[in-house]
Amino acid sequence: MSEKPQKSQKSEVKDYSKTLFLPQTEFPMRAGLPQREPEILKYWNDIGLYDRLRQEAEGRTKFVLHDGPPYANGNIHIGHALNKILKDVVTKSQQMLGFDSNYVPGWDCHGLPIEWKIEEENYRKKGKQKPDFRDSAAMVAFRKECRAYATHWINVQREEFKRLGIIGDWDHPYQTMSYPAEAQIARELMKFAANGTLYRGSKPVMWSVVEKTALAEAEVEYEDYTSDMVWVKFPVTSPAHGALASASVVIWTTTPWTLPGNRAISFSPKIAYGLYKVTDAPADNWAKTGDLLILADALAAEVFKQARVTTYEKVRELPADTLDAVECAHPLKGFSGGYEFTVPLLPGDHVTDDTGTGFVHTAPGHGREDFDVWMANARELEARGINTTIPYTVDENGAFTDHAPGFVGKRVINDKGEKGDANEAVIKALIDAGKLLARGRLKHQYPHSWRSKKPVIFRNTPQWFIAMDKDISANGHAKKGDTLRARALHAISVTQWVPPSGENRINGMIANRPDWVISRQRAWGVPIAVFVREKSDGSAEILQDEIVNQRIAEAFMEEGADAWYMDGARERFLGSRASEDWKKVDDICDVWFDSGSTHAFVLEDRQNFPQLGNIVRKVDGGSDTVMYLEGSDQHRGWFHSSLLESAGTRGRAPYDIVLTHGFTLDENGRKMSKSLGNTVEPQKVIKDSGADILRLWVCATDYADDQRIGPEILKNTIETYRKLRNSIRWMLGTLHHFKPSEKVAYAEMPELERLMLHELAGHAETVRNAYAAFDYKTVVASLAAFMNSELSAFYFDIRKDTLYCDPPSSPARKAALTTIDLLCDAILKWLAPILSFTTDEAWRMFRPNAEPSVHLTLFPADIEKLRDDKLAAKWETIRNVRRAVTGALELERAAKNIGSSLEASPVIYVADRDMLATLFDTDLAEVCITSNYEVRESEAPASAFRLDAVPGVAVVVEKAVGTKCARSWKISQTVGEDPEYPDVTPRDAQALREWKALGVGV
């Protein structure tokens, strides 16, 4: 190493810091987002940002993200925040990609949760009686209370969503309870009535005794529950099987209360069955010695164990293909004079020999598969003289009706959701009849209502359905095979699903789903606004009268759906037909039908939503796009109901793209729960750190899967944000000295600037493609890596000397400022959809005379043309050499041989002549931030520093020779050459003269 350079005496050192072009900006280092963001929201409101966005986008192709409506009940939670932020990023990025991306928020307003709240807060807590909905005035008054409650929470949630930085038409949101919406929902229902797919049927539905309503699949969750289980004997009666005359088919069930509704036994043709004989059993046992039992071979041993049978033998095999001719008696035959009917055996694909007996007790009024098997065989059963009418054995209160002789009034579940006395009553009757083989208890997963958290039952009820497999009629004519299921499956195949796995998921649901139950027996909703009369076969004829329908729709438009429940509504709407025997249906529509119709009263309503109502999608010969975006549970929710509603009335899906996100868990991967204390409230994150932190967290995660959030994850997000903000702040401060009139043309720029623009071009392609593909984590990862590694740690670090110390006239300095201006412009625009507040604050400092908001700009265009792959390849070599030099400098600094890298003058040994030629015209001192350097084509000393990743390069760090420049701190032998400024280099002396010429004292 060379000798240490001579240091100047302290008394001789001048302070040139004021002559440096250091960054200057009012953009603060500390973000202060919780205080600053509300000011930015006010600014957006003051400039009319939403309206300006619409004006800027006029005439563009439309990309509309149609809002899946949150429920107007309670404050928003972290799932709401994730969902709304994603929607906002989609909307803003599509707008900046050149589309007209208009976001109209909406709310789901009807339904049971609000009814529950009103009943609880306005009635139960006050000791008041729940309204009698048979009274028109009471019904209308209750509905007004529900409307007021929903309105309150819409206003609360609206402000919470706006605080997240969501830009949309908050002054004109859609609401499923608005009068135009209720009118259109009624019209949509009438379309199903007109095309022949709406019908009143008898079918088992999931029923909540506590809530007194049918539940959709999306409203049911499975929880642990302990059930009674029984093994029951059904005596064989069919004369064709004389050999089995004394035998019994054994079934197993965990719902003994459904046995009064039993009408068949299902078996599988794929299972091996046998006839078994009990050869020994305890005297007090329900299974008796000599009993002949028909069982699946694979389950016989377990059944006899449960029945406490000591020994048994298999009498004979019983081929499954002989079972469909077997008929049995009901085990309660003769009980209270009932159950005097034949119980046939029917083949069913749902039967297995994993558990039970290999036979499934089939009560078509209490199970979906039971119903399907029964109806699939209905014609054949009727030909055999078997009545296929499905009984109504259980009423809305969970009590047995007179269709269950001997058990009338017994409760399956009581009003509190507790197990009633029905099971024990049925079991006792079975014991008395000698038909119980065994009993026990089983803890298993059982369906519960997602609201009341109480168990539900399947019960046969009159409900309104939309048929999935009936040919759809148009003007009285139906095309064979043109069913709702067929239409929906086709629509799925021509929709873009993000991620693609969503297609298989919803396809499977549609392919296998039953008819769509759309009725609820509640008060707060849009009524099933049709009139019916009873037919002789027990079905309902729906009035098809366009004048009546128009009268209803017009009334709803002016007065809301309350008009249906007012005194005199029947006579008002029927008009001259009021004398006929038409009855008004008082059931309401399922809320999924409400929200499934939003496309009709938002995307197609030119009067109330004029900027959305003129959408012309590709399926209609246009170029506009509609996206739906919700959580993955909406494959069976809003995506599902919207698809069925639109396919049934318009023959296509209401959307072109469907994007789904996962659920939010705590940082340990657990479901959030107040009882666990692991919830993350968006309001607290905003108060502590700001909405931009939440926005960055959302976009940095893989939203397609379940995401995690918690203190440590937020801490890491804040650190990522801090680095991004610091880079933006440095660029803004540096550009304080930039004059647009001094821009440097690309061809005149140094290689380093052209290299950075090449890198910018690469990221431009990545970012645009990622935004177009809704891949926001790639946007964040790409820009964070670019800003931290390529800019802050490489380019900015190298160029600080040029930017701070070069004379104002320096071409290199002007080129660097021109480049940073381009970088800052692109980065602020690219980050705008994500860091909406931060980038807008920065934009107004960066471009004070341009657009008043970064959100009014487009993503930068034509950057891709700045690519220079040849230059990038050259600089890959240079940067490899820099890595070797940096490694050597770090060792010397650790050994305290040097402090700053400017104290060094590395000697770089290069063995490869091609590499040597590449380095020939490169100032490696500038690139490596040293005061000098030397490149040698010779053998390096054994002690030289080497990197395995950079073969052929070795580095020896020597001390820089010369005097330390008092201004730039570089060590140079040229210090002192300028007599006017003898303590600085000639470069710095020229800068000082130019400063002096500007009137600055130096």
UniProtKB/Swiss-Prot annotation:
Monomer. NCBIfam families: ileS. SUPFAM superfamilies: Anticodon-binding domain of a subclass of class I aminoacyl-tRNA synthetases, Nucleotidylyl transferase, ValRS/IleRS/LeuRS editing domain. It is found in: Cytoplasm. Catalyzes the attachment of isoleucine to tRNA(Ile). As IleRS can inadvertently accommodate and process structurally similar amino acids such as valine, to avoid such errors it has two additional distinct tRNA(Ile)-dependent editing activities. One activity is designated as 'pretransfer' editing and involves the hydrolysis of activated Val-AMP. The other activity is designated 'posttransfer' editing and involves deacylation of mischarged Val-tRNA(Ile). It holds the Pfam family Anticodon_1. Its main location: cytoplasm. One of its GO terms (molecular function) is ATP binding. Its EC number is 6.1.1.5. The lineage of its organism: Bacteria, Pseudomonadati, Pseudomonadota, Alphaproteobacteria, Hyphomicrobiales. PANTHER family: ISOLEUCINE--TRNA LIGASE, MITOCHONDRIAL, SOLEUCYL-TRNA SYNTHETASE. The keyword Ligase applies. Belongs to the class-I aminoacyl-tRNA synthetase family. IleS type 1 subfamily. This is Isoleucine--tRNA ligase. HAMAP family: Ile_tRNA_synth_type1 (MF_02002). ATP binds at K674.
